[in-house]
Amino acid sequence: MKRQWFKQPLHRLLHALNTGDASLPEIVTSFYQRIGTREPLVQAWQYLIDEEDYLAEYESNKAFYQASPLKGLPFAVKDVIDTAGIPTSMGSAIHAERIPSMDASCVTAMKAAGGILIGKTVTTEFAYFQAGKTNHPHDAERTPGGSSSGSAAAVADYMVPIAFGTQTAASVIRPASFCGCVGYVGSRGEFSLRNIQPLAQSLDSLGIISNHVLDTQLIRDVLLQKSLQAAVVAAKPVLNFTVFDGQNLGEVSVEMLEALAQCQQTLLSHGHTQVAFPFVAEAVELTALHGQIMAFEVARNLVFEQQHTGLSEHMQGLLHTGLALSYGEYIAALARVEAIKQILLQWMGEQKIDVILAPAAAGIAPLKTAGTGAPFMSRAWQVLGLPTVSLPLAYHQKMPLGLQLIAQ
């Protein structure tokens, strides 16, 4: 029986190549066959490299790829991440013909480690709220989330083992939660943003979307120029954790709250320690501050685009809000965020908090008629610049629910 290599996570594909259980062309063909079958329904791709061109690149540099850490395996990037010679339209008709001359740093790092770009994934308009064409891989009537919609859908549907997204509010964590993937956003400044189209520079982050935490660790090591030894996740004997359920920020579904409570009880039953979370009011304030900072910066970054008629009503509304904010209000918001961050980090240090548990989204993916989903569960952590990860936690109506972990 023919192996379905496309269903294997990255680290297992690497093992198969290292042991001779599979060849690179065999694995790549498996992914292209999956894309050919599923893309008409999911519509995750903005631009796809032709299979013949992919394999020709591998064959022309076969010795390099066989000796490289990633062995020529495929990766994808969100269509706000520059790729030399390949269009980067940022989900907007305004930039439909834009072809960058340089790769983004994350693309360069992946290529240097032996990854081969398979394509660009669909993004919402300028990585904000206006949805693209992508459907949820488990239910075409539902949103895959935004703005890294194509990246999450492509990974969740086994069309590619690794995809990069970006997050300014909740654009990696939320779609990862909706689609049932692992979504990782590093600490502010952990990954280079060079040649990634900016939305709000104080908030923008690069994210990794995968189907396994070991794959996320491997790709994190690639971006940080670390040696790619076999990834090992070390378990801590006793975890000190706190829980924030997000109900003060907006409506969180009963199913999400029940899944979070079950996770909490499981940790306690295994001897881990919970500390009460005392910063609910600050989380609400941070969420509002995030909105102010984002609106101010987006309005100043998209000056060129404001002159065009192709902007969505969503984006026009954000620009209107941002232009109404003064520089003094913006600076005050940044200062307040920093003050809260220092208090929170001091408390986490004193209490020896390893992780904050929270919903990764308000619930399962909503119907597309309701938009791309509410981002309020990530705004506070994103404005603080803390590292976050979304992990598949449970299912409701056969749709994934994600757990968000926030660290220092």
Question: Each predicted region: which residue ranges?
Answer:
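Gly/Ser-rich, acidic/histidine-flanked active-site/gating loops
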Residues: 6, 72-75, 84-87, 221-289, ...
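Short, well-ordered alpha-helical
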Residues: 1-99, 127-128, 365
